[in-house]
């Protein structure tokens, strides 16, 4: 594989684009508005500038990486790509439309991957005529730094597709794990209910935000407490994953806590909104 298209220029999409470009891949970064594309490219530029400042890369390397990334609002730019990674909003209807469009645009051998954190790869693949070439590639934030990629098979994903994506993940410095399709996959099925339980402990008045996080950092050796981590991920994303886990399994242990819903309804989404369980506006 030589050329990759990333659909969605938000934090995850931009990070994925940076990770590929840093390892020599030609990358197309696509979003629906020029302002979104420009914001994504600026995000990558700032990330690379920080690496230059820290002495981790040279200025010339930064320039080389940036020249490998082209931004666009034209989905047809994915036509000659070997791999397309969708990192759009976590809604099945939107993802299926994107994959249906890509199926018509891309060459027959192109692999179509989704960065979904919890949705069904099999259902996404049903929107295409190439379900054998549809797969999940779940990156973690920040994508240029985090080593893990969950590689998720849909019911029709071929071994050839899986092997190609695994090899490509290793080529960009990641350490992939193979995951059978299931709600939340591995990490989020364990992690998000833990965050939800921490919300419940807070709501019941058992401990404060700070003490809940301190307890898990000192008692379980977690680098970040569950409520701080929820703010980092985005409380809206945490809620969306809990909703998928609950609706898919019907298990009450995955029911999102009322307080989590209230925060999301209030627009208190964590770091990205300036307020979540902590105040980031200062």
Curated annotation (Swiss-Prot):
Catalytic activity: (3S)-3-hydroxybutanoyl-CoA + NADP(+) = acetoacetyl-CoA + NADPH + H(+)
Molecular function (Gene Ontology), one example: NAD+ binding
Keywords linked to the UniProt accession: Fatty acid metabolism, Lipid metabolism, NADP, Oxidoreductase
Domain of life: Bacteria
Site positions for Important for catalytic activity: 138
Pathway assigned to this chain's UniProt record: Lipid metabolism; butanoate metabolism
Annotated family: Belongs to the 3-hydroxyacyl-CoA dehydrogenase family.
Protein name, UniProt field: 3-hydroxybutyryl-CoA dehydrogenase
């Amino acid at each position: 594989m030589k050329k990759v298209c990333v659909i969605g220029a938000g934090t995850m999409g931009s990070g994925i684009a940076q990770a590929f470009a840093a390892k020599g891949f030609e990358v197309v970064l696509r979003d629906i508005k020029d302002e979104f594309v420009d914001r994504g490219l600026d995000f990558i530029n700032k990330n690379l500038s920080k690496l230059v400042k820290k002495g981790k890369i040279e200025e010339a390397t930064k320039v080389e990486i940036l020249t490998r990334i082209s931004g666009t609002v034209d989905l047809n730019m994915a036509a000659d790509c070997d791999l397309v990674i969708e990192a759009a909003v976590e809604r099945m209807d939107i993802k299926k439309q994107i994959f249906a469009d890509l199926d018509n645009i891309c060459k027959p051998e192109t692999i179509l991957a989704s960065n979904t954190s919890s949705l069904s790869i099999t259902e996404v693949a049903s929107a295409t005529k190439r379900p054998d070439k549809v797969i999940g590639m779940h990156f973690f934030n920040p994508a240029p730094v985090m080593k893990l990629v969950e590689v998720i098979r849909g019911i029709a994903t071929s071994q050839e597709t899986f092997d190609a994506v695994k090899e490509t993940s290793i080529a960009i410095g990641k350490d992939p794990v193979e995951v059978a399709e299931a709600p939340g996959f591995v990490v989020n099925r364990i992690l998000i209910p833990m965050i939800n339980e921490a919300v419940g402990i807070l709501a019941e008045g058992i401990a404060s935000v700070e003490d809940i996080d301190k307890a898990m950092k000192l008692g379980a050796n977690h680098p970040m407490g569950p409520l701080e981590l929820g703010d980092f991920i985005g409380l809206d994303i945490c809620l969306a994953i809990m909703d998928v886990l609950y609706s898919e399994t019907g298990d009450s242990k995955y029911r999102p806590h009322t307080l989590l819903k209230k925060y999301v309804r209030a627009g208190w989404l964590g770091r990205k909104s300036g307020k979540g369980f902590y105040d980031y506006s200062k």
